[in-house]
């Protein structure tokens, strides 16, 4: 089914729990770059294009060994950018819908920007399958642990592509620390913090009787979110709403496809879902 906003309203109204699944397209509406779109990485970081460095080459543990200054600048710059960006209105719309349900919500996201938590979502109900820049871990994963990055306030030199502030260190072994994000060819990623939330998500799904999955901005380049959304909706025999301006196709007729940007779709659905509130505003 395609572009039927009324059907989206029906699915959300009858649900007793909302599973929000989100890819990079959810963050794009806040003004953040999408590295997986065509030319997206080099458009955001033209200096890497000049040196013919791809996203896959800088987003790897090897970068911390062979190009340490550049790796710390890249992730420090991204952390500063994410912290300085305000999550768009769509996050609050989703939060209002989800908090009204008897079983509430859970978030499954490949985004590492921490914007669901920044928008007020409960961290214990946000499973960040690729980790988050808001946590750090040992470069060598000495204990298999991660910790909050709140005390790490990177100061970046965008001309010389380096940090001017101190690099983070591991509190356990004293070695260097890195962002707690799953990178390419990453065998040292400390997954424990997210693993706990994965278990909570699986337990929550067993409790929900009438699930609706709302997928936002999840592309095909790395289809982790899309596959999880489809698999879960099928297993729970629940409703499924895929929101994507380009890759909105769905595998089943009763699944809903909305060829729209995340924020536009959420606002349009909310207008129909809460007409009295819109009138007051």
What do the PLM-derived regions correspond to, one by one?
Residues 1-281:
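Conserved catalytic alpha/beta core of Sir2/sirtuin-type deacylases, generalized to analogous enzyme cores
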């Amino acid at each position: 089914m395609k572009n039927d906003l009324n059907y989206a309203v029906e699915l959300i109204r009858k649900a007793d729990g909302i599973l929000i699944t989100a890819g990079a397209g959810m963050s794009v509406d806040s003004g953040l770059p999408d590295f997986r779109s065509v030319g997206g990485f080099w458009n955001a970081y033209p200096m890497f294009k000049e040196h013919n460095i791809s996203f896959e080459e800088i987003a790897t543990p090897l970068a911390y060994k062979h190009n340490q200054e550049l790796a710390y600048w890249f992730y420090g710059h991204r952390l500063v950018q994410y912290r300085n960006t305000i999550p768009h209105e769509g996050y609050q719309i989703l939060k209002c819908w989800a908090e009204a349900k008897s079983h509430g919500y859970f978030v499954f996201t490949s985004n590492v920007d921490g914007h669901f938590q920044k928008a007020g979502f409960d961290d214990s109900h946000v499973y960040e399958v690729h980790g988050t820049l808001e946590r750090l871990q040992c470069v060598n994963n000495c204990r298999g642990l991660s910790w909050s990055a709140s005390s790490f306030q990177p100061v970046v030199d965008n001309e010389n592509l380096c940090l001017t502030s101190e690099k983070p260190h591991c509190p356990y072994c004293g070695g260097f620390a890195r962002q707690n994000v799953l990178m390419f060819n990453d065998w040292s990623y400390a997954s424990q913090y997210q693993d706990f939330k994965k278990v909570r998500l699986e337990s929550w799904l067993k409790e929900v009787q009438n699930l609706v999955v709302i997928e936002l901005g999840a592309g095909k380049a790395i289809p982790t979110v899309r596959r999880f959304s489809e698999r879960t909706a099928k297993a729970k025999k629940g409703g499924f709403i895929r929101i994507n301006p380009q890759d909105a196709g769905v595998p089943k007729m009763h699944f809903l496809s909305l060829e729209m940007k995340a924020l536009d779709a959420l606002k349009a659905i909310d207008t129909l879902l809460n007409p009295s509130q819109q009138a007051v505003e």
